[in-house]
Regions:
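Glycine-rich phosphate-binding segment of PLP-dependent enzymes
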Residues: 1-49
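Short loop-beta-helix segment that forms the pyridoxal 5′-phosphate
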Residues: 44-68
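Short secondary-structure boundary micro-motifs
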Residues: 37-40, 54-55, 196-198
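Conserved PLP-enzyme active-site core in the AAT-like
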Residues: 9-15, 19-22, 30-31, 59-216
């Protein structure tokens, strides 16, 4: 798996013709920053996505998730988590805990379906939870602080297929933190419209002190 993913990243760099020029400093306002733009093209290639946003200004995975959610949800929309409660750090983003600037404050409602006792998806109640207001379904790949197992890409693909069968136009976003490069495929290979992650974790190789990405 490690060798496969190493080759996949190298191919992404080769396909986008990464060279020494991409590591040169730029001046001005950062317009037409060749290094930055090419890095984002590499991420899009590696994750088999149409495009990607990769920036140090996305200071963490939580920040990247906040941007992704805020960019796709509007007042009156509903966010659904079919895998139970997300990370504690997202509670204030969503509005589970009251916070200034939360999605709830801007009129975005939230609904969640807890996992079954054996840690599998509760498909029956997920189907009931999807309604005309459901705009985005967020799937947290990592178990986080919960005792449940981390989901495989295959499991995520099955869940996405189930959701899309009920409501094809719904946006399926995967919180990919801690999940990058641990399998030979990523959620974008099995139907995810968007994946979000942190450069502090797997993509940064333990070296990046900051950064995040959104690809879809």
């Amino acid at each position: 798996t490690a060798e496969y993913n190493q080759l996949k990243v190298l191919k992404g760099m080769q396909d986008n013709k990464v060279s020494d020029i991409h590591f040169a400093a730029t001046t001005g306002y950062g317009y037409n920053d060749l290094g930055r733009d090419t890095l984002e093209d590499v991420y899009a290639s590696v994750f088999h996505a149409e495009s990607a946003l990769v920036r140090p200004q996305l200071i963490s995975g939580t920040h990247a998730l906040h941007i992704a959610l805020s960019g796709n949800l509007r007042p009156g929309d509903e966010l659904l988590s079919p895998v139970g409660k997300p990370y504690d750090t997202l509670e204030e983003v969503i509005g589970i805990r009251d916070s200034v600037g939360s999605l709830k404050e801007y009129g975005v409602s939230y609904r969640q379906v807890d996992l079954l006792p054996d840690g599998t998806f509760d498909y029956e109640n997920i189907a009931k939870a999807i309604n005309e207001k459901t705009k985005l379904v967020t799937i947290q790949r990592s178990k986080g602080y919960d005792p449940r197992p981390t989901f495989s890409v295959k499991q995520i693909g099955e869940l996405i297929a189930f959701v899309k069968k009920i409501k094809p136009e719904v946006i399926c976003m995967v919180d990919n933190c801690y999940g990058e490069f641990v399998e030979t495929i990523e959620p974008t290979d099995v139907g995810a419209d968007m994946i979000v992650g942190s450069l502090i974790k797997n993509p940064g190789g333990g070296l990046a002190p900051i950064g995040g990405y959104i690809a879809g």
